[in-house]
């Protein structure tokens, strides 16, 4: 189960924005976040049409999952033989992880659209309409 499934779309959006604002401090970071919020479908787009994240908010959920996994890997790898639970990433490392993970699929904004599709219902054998991404 991912963050979106556990907490809902609005909470996932807030979580993304909190991570972004807390960790990304480069020039124009605020403009980037504003662009994502106001001019793209980043927070509602799917991450694919058929595979993981092929649902509303899938791109957001995928980006958050990548962030949390990458951060855990970075802490584990950088901690070495130390207790990973005690290791803290530097501000620069936190920023790097946030940028890489949260924005790695930003090129997918505006790529998918919801359309009516047709499929054969396996239970009834009848063709039916459904909403799917293309």
Question: Where are the language model's segments positioned?
Answer:
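Divalent metal-coordination and catalytic microenvironments
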Residues: 66
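Active-site flanking loop/helix segments enriched in acidic
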Residues: 38-62, 133-134
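Amphipathic, non-membrane alpha-helical segments in soluble helical-bundle scaffolds
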Residues: 26-29, 56-60, 93-96
């Amino acid at each position: 189960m991912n963050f979106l499934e556990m907490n809902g779309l609005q909470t996932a959006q807030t979580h993304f924005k909190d991570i972004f604002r807390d960790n990304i401090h480069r020039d124009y970071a605020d403009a980037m976040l504003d662009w994502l919020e106001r001019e793209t479908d980043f927070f509602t787009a799917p991450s694919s049409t058929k595979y993981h994240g092929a649902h509303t908010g899938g791109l957001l959920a995928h980006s958050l999952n990548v962030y949390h996994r990458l951060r855990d890997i970075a802490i584990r790898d950088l901690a070495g033989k130390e207790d990973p639970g005690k290791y803290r990433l530097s501000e620069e490392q936190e920023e790097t992880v946030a940028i890489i993970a949260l924005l790695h699929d930003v090129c997918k904004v505006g790529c998918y659209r919801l359309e009516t599709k047709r499929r054969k219902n396996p239970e009834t054998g009848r063709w039916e309409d459904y909403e799917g991404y293309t």
